[in-house]
A protein has these predicted regions:
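Polytopic transmembrane helical bundles with strong interfacial aromatic enrichment
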Residues: 1-520
Length: 520
């Protein structure tokens, strides 16, 4: 069933991944740098020191360049849902569209309104009003992130909705359940705090570059003082929310957790692999999954279920089942899901033929207010999405990509905590400028921060595969039935456009950094 649209699905996935990766190159800096600029402007308003005005305008200029390119790259993403993922849009558009609409109407207008005051309001409005505009721009950008992350979190953990048999759509039943789900709340805080860390590293890295060249040393030291403290605090918060993410994933997406750890066979007191080299063939042939590994005993069980002796299901348990621990095999879920898919097909046929007896019979099965309906929904429709798979092995994501991406993200996060703490401490004691090795490390930490941020999204999105909506809709079913050639052409057009935008951003940013702060 899915093979008919395989090439279209692949091109659609590649296009969305490419545009999302490019867009996310700009978003985290916007989320964090806005608050750093607001802090610096607050210091200017409180002290009336022209130094802080000059410093604020410099970082604000870099913020504006990044913001503009970020908006341009983000517009295309929402249109892709209608063009490449029309089945998805029909099936859950009522739910998924709501937070995106709120983001566009409320949050984006907030930031786009006040950013005009922020950039063009100097000497035209009072200092207090301008400062308020700067803070509201930063809050508006993060409010936009909230609603977008709510939509993404619903794809990971679909709640607050009910299936409407007549329209064959999932419809929202509780907005608060969607907007305030534990996945959405934790994902928001983990994403924005990690973005704050990236922005802090950007400011520290650029300032370190100035110190290496013995330029703008006062601005560099004071910028580092603010950014390193800001980044260190939020790096710790990111670690905390990351730990919470692991516990949530263990509960709602166990296959993602098993793939992240390359855990093929579940076990009690499962260890966490700190470092390891995978045997790629292990996914096909079995046997030891690693050439080499360093484990932390029982840590995976402790982090996932807050018990050192808890059972963590592995990939094989989730695919083939584990009767001892009550893990249902994927083959049974597929069979149950096919019953639901077949009933929907029967319902469609019955409506076309006007078969009222069949319509009444099937509607009773989907009526959760009756014992028969509640049982059918629990025993069969709960596994609806599985009905589109032909084999249990199809539910396994790319283990190697997840395993290494997760370790890049976590390893970089731990490194950033140490780096920012050390930079703050040495800068406070006026010893940072003499540590040229550390300044170079700070400069090179900037691209590492972007790599870690992208790796985090790889873990989140690749780990959900093969689902567009966890347990409800596979990616292959979500795609539009359009020629693959159409998608491939737009893929390369967008690739060229986004590459040009990235090149323009880097060129302008590097030129502005090289020029440095400007005197009024």
């Amino acid at each position: 069933m899915l093979s008919d649209y395989l090439s279209t699905v692949d091109w659609s996935r590649a296009q969305f991944a490419m545009t999302a990766i490019y867009h996310w190159l700009f978003v985290p800096l916007t989320l964090g740098l806005g608050f750093l600029v607001a802090i610096m402007e607050t210091l200017y308003v409180r002290t009336k020191d022209p130094f802080w005005l000059r410093t604020t305008k410099f970082w604000m200029r870099l913020f504006g360049i990044n913001f503009a390119i970020g908006v341009a790259t983000g517009l295309i993403l929402e249109f892709e849902f209608g063009t490449n993922w029309s089945n998805y849009s029909h099936f859950v558009g009522d739910i998924f569209g709501a937070p995106l609409a709120i983001e566009g109407i409320l949050a984006f207008f907030l930031e786009s309104t006040f950013i005009a005051v922020m950039f063009f309001g100097w000497r035209k409005v009072s200092r207090g009003f301008h400062l308020t505009a700067t803070w509201l721009t930063a809050f508006g950008a993060n409010l936009s992130a909230w609603w977008i992350l709510v939509a993404n979190s619903w794809m990971q953990y679909p709640v607050g909705c009910d299936f409407n048999l007549e329209t064959v759509r999932n419809e929202m039943t509780s907005f608060s359940a969607v907007a305030l789900s534990p996945v959405a709340v934790n994902k928001f805080f983990h994403t924005v705090t990690s973005s704050f860390v990236l922005a802090a590293l950007f400011v520290v890295g650029v300032s370190a570059w100035y110190l290496l060249r013995r330029r703008e040393q006062l601005m560099a030291r004071r910028s580092i003082a603010i950014a390193s403290a800001f980044g260190f605090v939020f790096a710790l918060v990111t670690a905390f929310t990351g730990d919470r993410s692991g516990a949530i994933v263990a509960r709602v997406q166990p296959m993602k957790l098993a793939a992240m750890e390359a855990l093929y066979d579940g076990q009690q007191g499962a260890p966490l692999t700190a470092v390891g080299i995978l045997r790629p063939e292990a996914q096909r042939t079995g046997g030891d999954a690693f050439y080499f590994r360093i484990d932390i005993p029982k840590m995976l069980s402790l982090m996932s279920f807050r018990s050192a002796d808890a059972f963590v299901p592995g990939i094989n348990d989730l695919v083939y089942g584990n009767e001892e621990y009550g893990v249902m095999p994927a083959s049974e879920k597929i069979e149950r899901g096919r019953v639901a898919v077949e009933e929907l097909g029967r319902y469609r046929t019955a409506r076309e033929k006007g078969d009222t007896a069949a319509i009444t019979e099937i509607e009773a099965k989907f009526d959760r207010s009756t014992p028969q309906g509640a049982e059918f929904l629990r025993e069969h429709f709960a596994y609806f999405g599985y009905g589109y798979f032909s084999s249990p092995e199809q539910i396994v994501p790319d283990v190697s990509l997840l395993f290494y991406s997760f370790r890049v993200m976590v390893g970089a996060g731990c490194f950033f905590i140490l780096l920012l703490g050390l930079v703050w401490w040495l800068n406070r004691r006026d010893r940072l400028a003499s540590k040229r090795w550390l300044l170079r490390t700070a400069v090179w930490s900037v691209p590492l921060a972007y790599l870690a941020s992208q790796a985090g999204w790889v873990v989140a999105e690749v780990g959900r595969q093969p689902w567009a909506i966890q347990d409800l809709m596979p990616v292959g079913v979500a795609a539009s039935k359009i020629p693959s050639g159409s998608v491939s052409v737009t893929f390369f057009l967008f690739l060229a456009l986004f590459t040009a935008l990235l090149a323009a951003e880097l060129s302008i940013m590097f030129r502005q950094i090289k020029t440095g702060p400007k005197d009024d």
